[in-house]
């Protein structure tokens, strides 16, 4: 995963992540949510520019937002329990999307 992460809500749900080579890559935010159980905020995102018919890899990170709410730092998901919770929320989100 990239060493430095920027989380910016101002660019229409796009975040820019600096990869290992120092290049910035755009990712589109699928959704974000807060967990009271883990006392963290999470964001689910995927590479920007993918078509609706393309299979995409959805990534997840926890994040700490700055005081202004404009940027923040992405952090890795640390435990299996967090992953289980994220997968359950994602499954619910995708099921709701299919119903629409």
UniProtKB/Swiss-Prot annotation:
Pfam families: DUF1292. InterPro entries: UPF0473. Belongs to the UPF0473 family. PANTHER family: UPF0473 PROTEIN CBO2561/CLC_2432, UPF0473 PROTEIN CBO2561_CLC_2432. This is UPF0473 protein lmo1501. It comes from Listeria monocytogenes serovar 1/2a (strain ATCC BAA-679 / EGD-e).
């Amino acid at each position: 995963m990239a060493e430095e992460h920027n989380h910016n809500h101002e660019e229409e749900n796009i975040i820019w992540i600096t990869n290992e080579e120092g290049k910035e890559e755009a990712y589109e935010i699928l959704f974000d949510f807060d967990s009271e159980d883990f006392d963290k905020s999470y964001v689910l995102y995927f590479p920007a520019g993918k078509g609706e018919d393309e299979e995409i890899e959805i990534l997840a990170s926890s994040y700490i937002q700055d005081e202004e709410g404009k940027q923040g730092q992405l952090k890795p998901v640390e435990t299996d329990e967090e992953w289980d919770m994220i997968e359950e929320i994602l499954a619910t989100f995708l099921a709701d999307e299919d119903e629409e």
